[in-house]
Structure formats: C-alpha cells, structure tokens
C-alpha cells in the first residue's frame, strides 16, 4: 500500500507540473482596510479578487495575520495522505476534502489522453466516424467501437463531475468544449478553490461561525467546525456580486428599515418616480431623509429634482418603511461594513425554489430567518412594537463570505458554474498565461449545458 501511495504521489506531481508552478506565484492572503465608498463595491487594489477575503473587522484581520502559509502547500496537497496525521495538520476540513478530491480527479480524469475533438454535430448512441473515435480515445477507450453503451456511461459520468447539464450521455457542444479544455484547466480550478478554502477559519479558531457560499447560493452554520445547519440563500447577481469578505455579526434588527443604496436610488428609485410620479414613493412605502442621524428630518419629495437624481447629479437619502413590503423582510442581521451588505429576511420566499438564486443587489437573503435567528440568539427576538428595534447578539458571530465553484463529493469533486466569472479572473493571477489547451477555446464559455 505504501509503495502504491508513493507511486501515486509521483504521478500526480508529474501530471500536474503546470499546477505546481502556482506555488511560486501565490502569496499569503492580503489584509487590508475596507475603503470608504458607495456601491458598486470598491475592492482594495491589494486584494486578489476571486481569491482573497477583505478582512473588515480588526479581530478577523488579526486571525488572518497569525496564519503562516506553508510555501510548499500545493505540493503537499498533490501528495496528500488521507491519514489522521495529515487531517490534523490541514487548515480545515474543506481543504482536506478538496485536496483529496484533486487526487481523485487526477486518478479518474487526469491521466486520460488529452486529445482535441473538432467541433461538429452532437454525438450520441449509434454515432460513428472520426470524431467518435477521438472521443473514445479522449475518454480512455479504444477507437473503432462506435458510440456504444460503454461510451454513453463514461460521457454521462464525465458530465456529472464537470457540471454539464443534462448529464444525458450525449456529447453536445458544451461537453466537447469541456473535454477540449483539458484536465489541467479543471485541476487548476480545484487549486483555485483550495486557495479559497485555505482562507476559511482554521480548525478550532471559533466555536461558532457562518460561511456564506456565493458560488452555491447556500449558507452553512458551523458549531465547533461541524455543519449544524444549512439553507439556501439569494446572493448578488453577476453585476452586483456579493463580495468575498470576513466580518463579524454583532447585532440584528427586527422590523428593519431598508436604507436604499445610492446606486439604486439613481438607477431605480429616481427612474420609477420620473416614470410613475411621486405616488410611486407612497405606494412602495419610501421616504426621503435629510441625513442618517437619529434626529433626521423628512424631506418633501416634491422639492427634489428627480431628473437630476436619475442623472447622478444630485444625491439624496431614501429608506423603505418597516412592514411586509420591506426588502429586508422581518429581520436584518447586521455586520458593520462599508459595502452595505447584510444577511436578511425577504418577502419573496418563492425565489428559494429556483436554482438560479444570483438575483440580489449584493446582500444575502435567508431562506428561513427564524431558523437562523434561533441558531444565533437561542430564540427569535420579538419587537415590542411595529417600530424598528435593535438586538445585540449574545456572542459576536464571524461571517465568512466565500465563493466556491468546486464541491467535494464521495468520488472526488463536482464542478459548479462560475456565475461571477471569478475563476476566470483568478486563473491568470495564480498561473499566469493559460495553458495551450485551455487557450485554444473561448475562455468565456461556461462549463454548463449538455
């Protein structure tokens, strides 16, 4: 067994020699103060977007600074031993699972011939010809057998691992494009996600913490490094991404106001007022304020030049009143940050039944705020009146907002779509120029679709 493991580790290092070059290119996660500014989110230049967190709270920054990143971490992953000693020395369980997944991916798909298959009509059961022979070779079968049942099963398995839907055994345009990207491309995507996993809390750092995964549009509640609960969330769209940041949740508000971000006042609120008149504000329970202080005065909407607001030449402050119509729903969980990002309830529960949940303006909408509040407080806080009321958390809870496009599975990994395009952004940061096989195809094309 030991000899086999040694041979396997050597093979991994040989097969993924391009990946190993990343070790020299990667640096410790940058720690930087969050810049002041309105939406859209302005990320510090020192941050590698798609890889690093913005550490908002000084306590989170100090945790990040204490971590010493091993220079040869990627080599360690490729020669990973799944024994107890390796698990003990790993930064966190997800890192271990993805490291094992990288090995299993290499064993299942990395050693296959990396031949190119020309574009053409979809290939399916019964198809024959040169392209079918190339497909068989690419997937480790001998040529000449046609598109038989064995090939159907292997194509179906490949589609399932690589996030190609439907996984129907038909080699269509997206499947051929995925195969032509080559194993190095996908191994690098696993490595990018290992980088993201490395930045999550090390084992035994916090008793309780929350991980918001914008790549999966899901949230995980951790008790002593084990998932105590999970739920679907709605996160930012591709245009208004939920940022990768580490922050501490310290309070929550029941019956919250929604303070409309300046960008939305210009692009949405002012536009609707100009189209529908001032009645729009009343119909949707908006009010204009003089400032954000406790003694703020209401501003008469008819005194405002809404056309100038829509052009961005006049700034105003708008908030939505508490109630069933409010975009924050019944409860907002506050995490002090200059991005205006919160976890909150929503009146639009129907969205959680959808697979496409990349719909918000950057905030995180919770599928079940009551379940979340019970985990945080021990019970759901009750306001004394319909007015907004603030509740301090019994203990501050760290929140890690990450972005994972590869998930560990029983047989290795499963690739997800890259809705924010952050894998494509991180690829040159980690590896320089794309590999020849990857660059031969459109880098903007997603892996999804059969």
Annotate each predicted stretch with a short phrase:
Residues 27-32:
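N-terminal signal peptide c-region/cleavage motif recognized by signal peptidases
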Residues 5-19:
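Bacterial N-terminal signal peptides that target proteins for export
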Residues 34-142, 149, 156-167, 173-450:
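Well-ordered beta-sheet/strand-loop patches within structured domains
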Residues 20-25:
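Hydrophobic helical h-region of N-terminal Sec-dependent signal peptides
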């Amino acid at each position: 067994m030991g000899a086999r493991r040694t041979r396997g580790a050597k093979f991994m290092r040989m097969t993924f020699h391009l990946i190993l070059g990343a070790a020299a290119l990667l640096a410790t996660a940058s720690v930087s103060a969050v810049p002041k500014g309105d939406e859209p989110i302005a990320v510090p230049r020192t941050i590698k977007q798609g890889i690093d967190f913005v550490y908002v709270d000084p306590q989170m920054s100090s945790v990040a600074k204490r971590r010493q990143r091993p220079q040869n971490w990627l080599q360690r992953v490729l020669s990973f031993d799944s024994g107890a000693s390796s698990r003990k020395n790993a930064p966190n369980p997800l890192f271990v699972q993805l490291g094992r997944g990288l090995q299993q991916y290499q064993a299942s798909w990395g050693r296959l011939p990396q031949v190119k298959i020309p574009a053409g009509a979809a290939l399916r059961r019964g198809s024959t010809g040169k392209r079918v022979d190339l497909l068989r070779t690419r997937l480790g079968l001998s040529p000449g057998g046609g598109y038989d049942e064995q090939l159907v099963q292997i194509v179906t398995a490949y589609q399932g691992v690589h996030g190609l839907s439907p996984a129907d055994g038909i080699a269509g345009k997206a499947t051929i494009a995925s195969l032509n990207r080559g194993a190095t491309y996908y191994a690098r995507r696993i490595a990018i996600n290992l980088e993201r996993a490395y930045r999550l809390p090390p084992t035994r750092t916090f008793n309780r913490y929350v991980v918001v995964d914008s790549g999966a549009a899901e949230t995980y509640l951790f008790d002593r490094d084990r998932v105590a609960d999970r739920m679907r969330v709605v996160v930012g769209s591709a245009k208004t991404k939920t940022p990768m940041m580490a922050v501490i949740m310290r309070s929550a508000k029941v019956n919250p106001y929604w303070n409309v971000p300046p960008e939305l006042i210009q692009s949405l609120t002012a536009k609707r007022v100009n189209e529908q008149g001032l009645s729009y504000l009343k119909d949707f329970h908006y009010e204009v304020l003089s400032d954000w202080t406790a003694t703020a005065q209401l501003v008469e909407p008819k005194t405002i030049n809404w056309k100038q607001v829509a052009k961005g030449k006049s700034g105003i402050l708008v908030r939505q009143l508490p109630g069933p119509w409010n975009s924050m729903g019944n409860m907002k969980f506050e995490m002090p940050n200059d991005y205006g990002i919160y976890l909150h309830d929503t009146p639009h529960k129907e969205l959680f039944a959808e697979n496409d949940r990349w719909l918000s303006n950057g905030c995180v909408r919770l599928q079940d705020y009551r379940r979340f509040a019970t985990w945080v407080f021990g019970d759901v806080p009750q306001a004394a009146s319909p007015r907004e009321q603030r509740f301090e958390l019994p203990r501050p809870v760290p929140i890690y907002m990450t972005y994972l496009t590869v998930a560990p599975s029983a047989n290795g990994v499963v690739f997800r779509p890259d809705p924010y395009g952050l894998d494509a952004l991180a690829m040159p940061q980690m590896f320089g120029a794309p590999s020849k096989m990857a660059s031969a195809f459109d880098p903007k094309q997603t892996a999804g679709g059969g």
